[in-house]
Amino acid sequence: MLIGGAQNRLYQLRTSNILGLLRTRSALRVGSKVELRCPYNNWTNLGRSHFSSTSIPPTFKSKTFGREKGLLAHNINVKRLSSTVSKSKLPNEDTAHNASEKNSKKTDTKAVNISELKILKDLFKYIWPRGNTKVKVRVLLALALLIGAKVLNVQVPFFFKQIIDGMNVDWSDATVALPAALGLTIMCYGLARFGAVLFGELRNAIFARVAQNAIRNVSLQTFEHLMKLDLGWHLSRQTGGLTRAMDRGTKGISYVLSAMVFHIIPITFEISVVCGILTYQFGASFAGITFTTMLLYSIFTIRTTAWRTRFRKEANKADNKGASVALDSLINFEAVKYFNNESYLANKYHNSLIKYRDSQVKVAQSLAFLNSGQSLIFTTALTGMMYMGCTGVIGGDLTVGDLVLINQLVFQLSVPLNFLGSVYRELKQSLIDMESLFKLRKNQVKIQNCSQPKSISKSDGPFEIKFENVTFGYDGQRKILKNASFTIPAGMKTAIAGPSGSGKSTVLKLVFRFYDPEEGRVLVNGVDVREYDIDQLRKAIGVVPQDTPLFNDTIWENVKFGRIEASDEEITRVIDKAQLSDLIAKLPQGSSTIVGERGLMISGGEKQRLAIARVLLKDADIMFFDEATSALDTHTEQSLLRTIRRNFNSGEKTSVYIAHRLRTIADADKIIVLEEGTVREEGTHQELLARENSLYKELWRIQEDLDLLEDEINHEKETLEKLNKSI
């Protein structure tokens, strides 16, 4: 009963305070219900998570609602109210990227139409790089070995013909011995076969380094290009599909290079040589059949493969979708478990697999049709040539050895022809895979240095940040900041407060140059941030975000990520300053403990301390704390705030605190309150509380009242527990 009474007072106080805000906010009536526009988009943003240990009644009635401002609502559902408020038409920066995704994808589609010829041309730059003599020598040597292997390979049927013709004697006569010339021909036959294989393997070994270097360079340059793309581009992409596209693209490069050097060029050379030999040895009729066969075979293969290409594209699309679903599910494993949505995601993944299966079945069926057609064309030609050869032997124009030579030459073409079909097929598929990779490289880098960027260094600090009439929106339509102007003083602690979606976190993104403003300027020490060198600007800014991004590596390596070149002594020092030493001492593996993917193996407070250690190591002159303590309990929050004050409140650094919890910023030298993308008010904590109609004052009163009631509830809980124990 004690706790229940406190809870009811908590609900009533929350209700009355919300109604106080309604005096300065709008209320939208929808039917017999009322949608409330509140400065915060959900209940927890009005204070701490007050209902974490208490249950919220599904509905509550209050006559106060009916009397206040003529509102006619008699029964307001808390969940509906929370949902309604969160859907209020405030510029929501958390969801602003959804609209930009469509625009981004449209832009990408227009910008990255790449032909297969263009892909091969771009790839050739890596096979024949300018100024790299070693690679060029390897390529030329590989081509020489290729030609040598094919010349020896064509000689094999001639040696075999001579052996057959040389055997055309009466071996029943005991006086007949194996001629020395025939023995030499047999040896040459064996050497030619072995030489062709040896030259081919040497070619493979020599060209392997060229191919792998090309793959390495393309992959590295693609990765570096992706790292340069703006934040909006990355937020509009699914990581699983992106990594799968890169993986398939690099494999496609490997196949294209091997196909070009090991198959297409050798096959073309061998077909030309065989046609020439047949024309010279046996007349134009044999060469004509051979040439016609090659032509029909190639046309059929190319047209059928072009028809099959769309099935491969469908399979790739389904594969990307499945990979994205799987990766998202694994990354958000906890959320999946919290909401018991394993079956939903399994079904979603299953649907992607079904689409992939159907596409792959079509690929296999069309492959069977292609192989059958190729075999029909080749077998028909071979049968016709054998008939002509047999007719020539019977007529005395050809020897048995000539018939064997024709058969060997044509059969020798069957292997490269079969390869030609599969190579062209795989080449087309690899080019499709490579197209996705090369498309990534064609995306425009929007945030770039100007022609003559200015440097920024510690000697220029402390830094003043100034926004001059800044307007910005993530999708170009809904504006998050609207003609906003304010100054963050140098070397002081400045806080930015306001409702969700008012543009608080956008301030950080614009200063850091994740984005550039549509209108106005962002100045650091009087210089537009667009005039600074991007790398130097970002080195001067340290960020402790609400959800610290950690790598699946050790604590030591995650801290070291703040400044890779830092010494062990420096890393140890910042670990001590961030009060991580006690945690590390308790761990069996100490600082070598793996934190898990995204830091899931350590608590929220420990993650934030690790983030503080990381930015301490970076030693930036401008510090942003973006809701750094909002996800922590009160005790951990206060402990972390003491650590932050101890390390960052000197006059040497400019500190900016973005916060919903106003208690955490009450000691700030300046507080800037944003509302709907504009500056509502600014001043110190005491100055803002002293003002009439102050938004900050209203928010402060609500949070303070809720904090007091939370303390009362906790006290009543403790009292009840003591009573239970005494009983």
UniProtKB/Swiss-Prot annotation:
Name the segments for region: Disordered. Answer: 87-107
Is the Nucleotide-binding keyword given for this protein? yes
Q: Which GO terms describe its cellular component?
A: mitochondrial inner membrane
- The membrane spanning regions, by residue number, are 139-160, 184-207, 257-280, 282-302, 369-387, 403-424
Q: Report the membrane topology from the UniProt record.
A: Multi-pass membrane protein
Principal location:
mitochondrion
The superkingdom listed in its UniProt entry is Eukaryota
Q: ABC transmembrane type-1 domain: which residues?
A: 139-429
Q: Which GO terms describe its molecular function?
A: ABC-type transporter activity; ATP binding; ATP hydrolysis activity
Pull the Mitochondrial matrix topological domain ranges from the record: 26-138, 208-256, 303-368, 425-727
Bias regions of kind Basic and acidic residues — which residues?
Answer: 90-107
- Keyword Secreted in annotation: no
Q: Known InterPro entries for this protein?
A: AAA+_ATPase, ABC1_TM_dom, ABC1_TM_sf, ABC_transporter-like_ATP-bd, ABC_transporter-like_CS, P-loop_NTPase, Type_1_exporter
Any GO BP annotation: iron-sulfur cluster export from the mitochondrion
Tell me which residues bind glutathione: 308-312, 371-374, 421
The record's subcellular location field reads: Mitochondrion inner membrane
Q: Which PANTHER family match?
A: ATP-BINDING CASSETTE SUB-FAMILY B, IRON-SULFUR CLUSTERS TRANSPORTER ABCB7, MITOCHONDRIAL
Name of the protein: Iron-sulfur clusters transporter ATM1, mitochondrial
Organism, by scientific name, is: Candida glabrata (strain ATCC 2001 / BCRC 20586 / JCM 3761 / NBRC 0622 / NRRL Y-65 / CBS 138) (Yeast)
Name the gene behind this protein.
ATM1
